[in-house]
Amino acid sequence: MNCSAQTVSTNDGVNVSLDLYGQGAHGTAVIICPGFFQSKDTVTFQRMSRALAGRFDVLAMDFRGHGKSSGLYTFSAREGADLEAVLAFARVRYQRIGVVGFSLGAAIAINTVSRHPDQVRSLIAVSAPSTFEQIEFKWWTPEAMRTGMQGLEPGAGCRPGNPLLKKARPIERAPRLAPLPILFIHGTRDVIVGVEHSRRLFAAASEPKRLEIIEGGSHAEALFRDDPQRFSDLVNEWLAQTLDPAPQSRKTERKNRKKL
């Protein structure tokens, strides 16, 4: 599996690091947006990127303040500019783009894509908070400690900025995603962002939409780490349904590629 390092710049001067898995031969890419303290460089996200690559290319990114990206993390206040820069990079290379966001990365994805729903074909929000203020991180519980310890992989970490900046609320942005297909995924044992967040977001979003509750599932990328096959199958199924072009579209895209 080919993997090449790329860097894009935001409109406010941040350099965003991303890894491109694939060769761009089939016109479809999926952007992976990790959450707070996580990085595309951890073993979990590298394995996930390789597991999802094949049918389409994968662009795994790091938000500001994470990994090799510059800047300080603002807890979803300014990270929309990071995703917009990656979307701009993808749009000149691919006809069809999907986005998979985790935790605060999912919140950023909802907030950002809702401003340009026509630029994305499919969205998956994993363990997304409906609002930043209502995240109920029960850090003192054994489950939270287990999840936190598992997340301390090499490559994880954050350079935090001001957490008090005004933030968009995904619960208010979700209705603006229409007609973009969106899949919400959440575990019932998520003690960082409770499952009710995805239930509220699902209720607020318009069709086409789907809510997948994973019984006994933990938080965000832990859903992949704990059961890679189930998570990959779920994500691949949704992306195949929403990203694969219709037969007539395939003919048009083949003609367009011949003209280039």
PLM features per residue range, with description:
Residues F36-S49:
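The serine-hydrolase catalytic nucleophile loop
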Residues L177-A178, F184-H186, D190:
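Short beta-strand/loop motif that positions the catalytic acidic residue
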Residues S114-P163, P175, L180:
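Hydrolase active-site cap/lid region
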Residues S49-S70:
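Conserved alpha/beta-hydrolase
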Residues V191-H197:
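Conserved alpha/beta-hydrolase "acid-adjacent" motif
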Residues G217-P228:
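Catalytic histidine-centered segment of alpha/beta-hydrolase-like enzymes
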Residues H66-R93:
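Catalytic nucleophile-loop/oxyanion-hole region of alpha/beta-hydrolase
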Residues M1-Q23:
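N-terminal cap/lid segment of alpha/beta-hydrolase-fold proteins
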